[in-house]
């Protein structure tokens, strides 16, 4: 059942990513792609896998290729730390911003993982970066990509900006080295959802959209403020096949008046349900055994990614993580709060216990840490 199917005429349909929480976008794209690639490779569709690998963008995200550093050529072994950064499409002359910053930590066995977000507004010390002429200083974390991307006399380099962002995240978390990194362009990801034919989700209770009409167009703001007016898209209780814009709209909802009694906690739960539904759909026989659909999904996914695996391709990582499945990925929430200075918002900061989390990550003791700190787990 496709609920609230969008029409073709009338108002121009806004971007489906408008207002969607960035962590959900990143996790959906890269997590589903990795598991999808491993499943495809295992069933032996070599030609399509090669086509996908050719579509994935490649760049020197860590700044060591130009220096002649030897790339990693041994088999992929855990533990692994992968930095995932989501960006929106921008003009070539505009400085890039890291709209979402996430770390995927995979223990030695390569069959489970922990995924956590770094708040883009986290107020941090950004280290000096000679390549971009940046002397270092305190700012919000997402600004590191902009500072690092500056190239004298040329358009900004997103890959070079990623390098400074990676150094900044390492200084915060204590991670010595990232084993891989990816830049995910949200602009093209809707094609993946369309190519898959929608996503099946089990909706726990009826939810009404704050933002969309049943045809997918935006509801209008009430004159003078006070919310939106017009008919709402409705997501009925039970198993539903949702189009891309519908699934993304559903995971935005957080108001009790619209059927989400636990507010933002409920929204986070719905987001994680969506992530796992996407990953499961990517591995379904309907996708993997359908050459036409498979080709469309692979090409759309490839066009949304720029990847650097320090000598290993995204296919190599997909195969190395072949035992990693949606149920084995633990979603982590890092508690924090806002910093106010003279009544002005400066950014976010972590609670002290987050440093203990980072130490447990370095010591490979996250399971023990989470037993003692269950509030760090995003339950689904």
PLM features per residue range, with description:
Residues 2-380:
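Non-catalytic, solvent-exposed segments at the cell envelope interface
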């Amino acid at each position: 059942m496709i609920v609230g199917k969008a029409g073709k005429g009338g108002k121009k349909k806004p971007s489906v990513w408008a207002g969607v929480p960035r962590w959900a976008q990143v996790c959906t794209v890269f997590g589903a792609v990795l598991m999808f690639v491993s499943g495809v490779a295992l069933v032996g569709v070599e030609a399509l896998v090669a086509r996908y690998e050719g579509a994935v963008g490649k760049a020197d995200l860590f700044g060591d290729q130009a220096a002649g550093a030897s790339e990693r050529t041994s088999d992929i072994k855990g533990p692994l730390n992968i930095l995932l950064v989501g960006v929106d499409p921008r003009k070539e002359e505009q400085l890039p911003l890291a709209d979402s910053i996430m770390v995927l930590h995979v223990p030695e066995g390569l069959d489970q993982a922990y995924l956590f977000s770094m708040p883009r507004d986290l107020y941090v010390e950004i280290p000096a970066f000679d390549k971009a002429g940046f002397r270092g200083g305190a700012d919000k974390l997402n600004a590191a990509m902009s500072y690092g991307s500056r190239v004298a006399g040329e358009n900004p380099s997103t890959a070079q900006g990623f390098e400074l962002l990676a150094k900044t995240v390492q200084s915060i978390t204590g991670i010595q080295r990232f084993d891989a990194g990816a830049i995910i362009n949200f602009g093209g990801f809707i094609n993946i959802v369309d190519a898959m034919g929608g996503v099946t989700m089990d909706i726990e209770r009826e939810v009404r959209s704050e933002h969309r009409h049943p045809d997918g167009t935006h509801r209008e703001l009430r004159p003078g403020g006070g919310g939106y007016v017009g008919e709402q898209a409705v997501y009925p209780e039970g198993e539903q096949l949702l189009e891309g814009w519908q699934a993304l709209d559903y995971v935005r909802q957080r108001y009790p008046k619209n059927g989400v009694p636990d507010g933002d906690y409920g929204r986070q739960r719905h987001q994680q349900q969506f992530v796992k539904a996407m990953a499961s759909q990517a591995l379904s026989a309907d996708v993997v055994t359908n050459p036409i659909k498979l080709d469309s999904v692979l090409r759309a996914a490839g066009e949304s990614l720029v990847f650097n695996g320090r000598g290993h391709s995204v296919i190599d990582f997909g195969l190395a993580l072949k035992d990693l499945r949606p149920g084995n990925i633990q979603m982590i929430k890092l508690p924090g709060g806002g910093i106010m200075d003279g009544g002005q918002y400066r950014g976010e900061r972590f609670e002290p216990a987050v440093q203990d989390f980072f130490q447990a990550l370095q010591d490979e003791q996250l399971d023990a840490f989470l037993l003692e700190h269950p509030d760090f787990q995003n339950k689904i």
